[in-house]
Regions:
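Adenine nucleotide-associated cytosolic modules
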Residues: 1-183
Length: 183
């Protein structure tokens, strides 16, 4: 089962970087549009949607029986909160972060004594960082690369194939065409 949690509405500015949505989805709830578009791709999917914000209180019902969490949020506070919840519930988390031309991916696995979001990012960068993303945007192809890497990490983790990016962070610089790994 795939669970999608979001309390946002599709906006025109989402379309250049969120390829799950189409122009006809603008103004619709993201969870409803996401479910419809995913089922259009594969009608055999089992998808549950929750039109609410993911937080400590709502997480109780949302993550029961989940094998893995995928963080697709766009702000520091949410990312930090999701990681804390994942560690509290001992559920692996695939993290992806973006800023303009750069992105990063990491798998946090509480069962393997892995690093956590707070270990890598101990300080909230503050509103200035959030504003820079809002003002300068995020480049669509960078989102595609990071999203694909996150999907690969989910598959590797769930199937025990390959070596997930645990206890390190993989960064991608779209402008330079370079990947770097930090342990």
């Amino acid at each position: 089962c795939i669970r999608i949690v979001d309390n946002d509405i599709v906006s025109l500015s989402n379309l250049q970087r969120q390829i799950l949505f189409k122009e006809e989805d603008v103004g619709k709830k993201k969870v409803i549009a996401a479910k419809k578009n995913l089922l259009d791709l594969n009608s055999h999917l089992n998808i549950e949607t929750f039109d609410e914000q993911f937080n400590e209180k709502s997480s109780r019902q949302l993550i029961d029986n989940c094998d893995i969490l995928i963080d697709g949020t766009d702000n520091f506070k949410s990312k930090s909160s999701i990681c804390k919840i994942a560690f509290k519930k001992t559920i692996p988390l695939v993290y992806g972060g973006l800023s303009q031309w750069e992105g990063q991916v990491c798998v946090f696995d509480p069962k393997s004594a892995s690093i956590c979001f707070g270990c890598i990012f101990p300080n909230d960068p503050g509103q200035e960082f959030e504003d820079s993303c809002l003002n300068f945007g995020i480049i669509g192809p960078t989102v595609g690369v990071i999203g694909s890497l996150m999907a690969a990490e989910v598959i590797k983790f769930l199937t025990s194939c390959g070596k997930p990016i645990i206890n390190k962070i993989l960064t991608y610089d779209c402008l330079q065409g370079e990947f770097q790994e930090f342990a």
